[in-house]
């Protein structure tokens, strides 16, 4: 197993770009790669999810967290310094598709050695005492395949629940929806490791990551550029959201690819927003010099 040196970055967009770079350019013909990283507080959506359905609007409005989207499917996850993310990148094989046990069993075994009663459930999550400690997803380009997941060690579970809680108004979309689960932190199940960095170092050893991949400056610059140009862009984070209908008191809004496609309100003033990005600051800016500025609270 070859450990990927991510230069100890906690920038979620950079770590997401590293994963895509390895999928597209990694030589997995003679080695498998392991990427371990700890992100700054963020919410990460699956590739095919609607951001408006998955994330609580209070958080969307106040921008309290970085919002991200990964290249794999699956559900939305919250990450912070109390969460360790792991990614296995290997050469593609049909037998690896949805074979989460192949990738996750070594992680489960490692956790059990430190006293965490970890098992895999029928949804391919890793659970402990009936509660979820790890969600997982996969992506392949038929050259390489990535199977990656989260490990809740000492995350802010109140923040997790608040930013992912359902809104108190109707949000409809045919996008893939997250399956909400009870969660727990592993720190409550082991006294052998005291912090997330300790878990990271332990997994390096137990998973036998005995060689290191270091990116050249040219490769690193390409990764950082991809993080800025793609993974941090409105088009990727918001724009990949499928058609979503938001129904609030006295107003109905249709949003597709992050853009207001239609809006129904008792006044005609709201229709000026058709074609506007459905994002709080964009709508606020569009309404600043309008008689309909009081619409802002109704719309977002």
Question: Where are the language model's segments positioned?
Answer:
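Contiguous, small/hydrophobic- and glycine-enriched helical/loop subdomains that border
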Residues: 83-124
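N-terminal lobe of the biotin/lipoate ligase/transferase fold
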Residues: 1-98
